[in-house]
Regions:
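N-terminal binding-site loop/beta-alpha segment at the start of enzyme catalytic domains
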Residues: 1-75, 148, 229
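N-terminal small/glycine-rich loop or linker at the start of catalytic domains
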Residues: 4-26, 77-97, 121, 126
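Short acidic/polar active-site loop segments enriched in Thr and Asp
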Residues: 9, 47, 120-123, 153, ...
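Conserved, mostly hydrophobic/aromatic
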Residues: 13, 41, 49, 64, ...
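A cross-domain feature marking catalytic cores of carbohydrate-active enzymes
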Residues: 15-17, 51-53, 78-80, 126-129, ...
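Short, acidic/polar
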Residues: 27-42, 99-118, 136-138, 165-170
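A structural motif corresponding to the C-terminal end of an alpha-helix
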Residues: 40-46, 115-121, 146-151, 205
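Beta/alpha (TIM)-barrel catalytic core signal, keyed to glycine-rich beta->alpha loops juxtaposed to Asp/Glu
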Residues: 132-257
Length: 257
């Protein structure tokens, strides 16, 4: 009998740091370490894993596939981030100009995710962020087709503005497409902007909110303290100041000083 979770909340493990050494965000780079982390997570009664095509240039998904997540009884969520028009690192297979949310790129990346994860479909698949170079109507038509093809059981969106959420939901209602049922966004004691407008929008459309970065990249734990020197912060960690912003927190370094 699996252990009973101690928290009534749905705790999801984010696998952003799983992946091949040298790829973006990857800090847990051996399969043995990844397996040990999953063992501890499951020992506490949790089963849902969150990854993304972008994490580790696709190697986070590959590691989870190699770790036979299905045989472990895990539930898998993944995402596809559009890099077109953004100054971001690309994976080896990215086209010139980056990925967008047009049909060709959506289908290619869903296929790549499923191949890496070694499965025919995942539980929850997200549009990881807005692509404002492609009409939502086109994107959502393809998302609905992928849903009908069994690529995922639930559709989610992440990092969209409240007005974009409303627009997406209205298009889906009008066209009879699968509705987004989950929104993943940053939320913690330092970053509460979602309370102002987004929460009301999600409540209106019946969309659940999944909070990522609840501990502000570790700032709200005992791991960091006032007076730490730059060399004491692990390079590439969620609390490493990069370009004036604390990686993974959405908060400028000045705010935390």
């Amino acid at each position: 009998m699996p252990p009973t979770p101690k928290s009534p909340l749905n705790i999801i493990f984010g696998a952003m740091t799983f992946g091949r050494a040298g790829t973006a965000q990857a800090r847990v780079t051996s399969l043995e370490e990844c397996a040990a982390i999953l063992d501890i997570f499951q020992a506490h009664g949790h089963t849902e894993i969150d990854t993304a095509r972008y994490y580790g240039a696709g190697t986070s998904e590959e590691y989870l596939g190699e770790l036979n997540w299905q045989d472990r009884g895990l539930v898998m969520d993944t995402k596809f981030y559009p890099t077109a028009g953004k100054n971001m690192p690309e994976d080896d297979g990215a086209p010139e100009g980056g990925w967008n949310h047009g049909e060709e790129h959506l289908r290619e990346n869903v296929g790549r995710s499923l191949e890496a994860l070694r499965c025919e479909g995942v539980d929850l698949w997200y549009l990881h962020g807005p692509d404002r170079t492609t009409a939502f109507e086109e994107t959502l038509r393809v998302v609905n087709a992928l849903y009908k093809e069994g690529c995922f059981s639930r559709f989610g969106i992440s990092n969209y503005m409240a007005w974009e959420v409303a627009q997406i939901c209205e298009i889906c209602r009008r066209e009879g497409y699968v509705m987004p049922t989950v929104y993943q966004g940053v939320y913690n004691a330092l970053h509460q902007t979602v309370e102002q407008e987004l929460f009301s929008c999600l409540r209106y459309y019946g969309v659940a909110f999944y909070a990522y970065n609840p501990l502000a990249g570790g700032y709200l734990t005992g791991r960091y303290w006032r007076g730490m020197q730059d060399g004491e912060v692990e390079r590439g960690s969620r609390f490493d100041v990069q370009g004036g912003e604390v990686a993974g927190t959405g908060v400028s370094g000045e705010v935390l000083e």
